[in-house]
Amino acid sequence: MFSRAGVAGLSAWTLQPQWIQVRNMATLKDITRRLKSIKNIQKITKSMKMVAAAKYARAERELKPARIYGLGSLALYEKADIKGPEDKKKHLLIGVSSDRGLCGAIHSSIAKQMKSEVATLTAAGKEVMLVGIGDKIRGILYRTHSDQFLVAFKEVGRKPPTFGDASVIALELLNSGYEFDEGSIIFNKFRSVISYKTEEKPIFSLNTVASADSMSIYDDIDADVLQNYQEYNLANIIYYSLKESTTSEQSARMTAMDNASKNASEMIDKLTLTFNRTRQAVITKELIEIISGAAALD
């Protein structure tokens, strides 16, 4: 006679192949579900890459004339050798980003540069105020530098920037009531499709430009003309930085989505191989059970 323990062990041994089969079927369902999800994600990343490529082509075309005007405006400060007075302490720091992500380290590189500049200027005894162009830079810096934010601009990056947008930003800065002595604008300069560089360019207030020693040689420039030119110059530099940042962002997003699509393809290949191996194991096991059962009947 069989003992209860022996019968229990026999029952467990008999049911074990069924449990293995159920587990393998569950694994196949999980793999199928993951494959479907990754394929859907790959469709999205490929579509985003195509959209970014179209926007990048337009941004690169519009960057060339904007770069000429921007570098021309910055040339005034270089050729006139305008420098901020040492005894003045008010410094304005402008960071250019956008409202959209999925573009690599575009926004974090700007935030990193701004944090470094804030630390350096604060250690030198300067009063630093921040301006964020784009919601991403505000989101990164606001938690640690909320008391230093002068103004933040949203709705940036959804459409190609225009000179009108830059003029609105420049006018808002001039009407903010903060009379800075000198400042800097930090943005990503476009270099190639796969490369960009975080750059910092100087900006100066009207009083700083008017009181510069090199400006005294221009006797025929009155205050109104200089003020109008300085306002236009500020808008021009902001427009130039927006165009550089937009082109860098679209190229970085195109590269990021291309890498994401390639990674999705690799995952699909690996999961497909795993699915085929698991399915083959299930089929082989079922054949073994059928053959074993037929042999037992004989």
Curated annotation (Swiss-Prot):
Modified residues (N6-acetyllysine): K39, K55, K115, K154, K197
Organs and tissues of expression: Isoform Heart is expressed specifically in the heart and skeletal muscle, which require rapid energy supply. Isoform Liver is expressed in the brain, liver and kidney. Isoform Heart and Isoform Liver are expressed in the skin, intestine, stomach and aorta.
Cystine pairs: none
SUPFAM superfamilies from the UniProt entry: ATP synthase (F1-ATPase), gamma subunit
Membrane topology: Peripheral membrane protein
Main localization (coarse): mitochondrion
Keywords, in A-Z order: Acetylation, ATP synthesis, CF(1), Hydrogen ion transport, Ion transport, Membrane, Mitochondrion, Mitochondrion inner membrane, Phosphoprotein, Transit peptide, Transport
InterPro entries from the UniProt entry: ATP_synth_F1_ATPase_gsu (IPR035968), ATP_synth_F1_gsu (IPR000131), ATP_synth_F1_gsu_CS (IPR023632)
Gene Ontology CC entries for this record: membrane; mitochondrial inner membrane; mitochondrial matrix; mitochondrion; proton-transporting ATP synthase complex
Transit peptide residues according to the UniProt entry: 1-25
Family the UniProt entry places it in: Belongs to the ATPase gamma chain family.
NCBIfam families registered for this protein in UniProt: ATPsyn_F1gamma
Subunit and interaction comment: Component of the ATP synthase complex composed at least of ATP5F1A/subunit alpha, ATP5F1B/subunit beta, ATP5MC1/subunit c (homooctomer), MT-ATP6/subunit a, MT-ATP8/subunit 8, ATP5ME/subunit e, ATP5MF/subunit f, ATP5MG/subunit g, ATP5MK/subunit k, ATP5MJ/subunit j, ATP5F1C/subunit gamma, ATP5F1D/subunit delta, ATP5F1E/subunit epsilon, ATP5PF/subunit F6, ATP5PB/subunit b, ATP5PD/subunit d, ATP5PO/subunit OSCP.
The protein, known as: ATP synthase F(1) complex subunit gamma, mitochondrial
Lineage: Eukaryota, Metazoa, Chordata, Craniata, Vertebrata
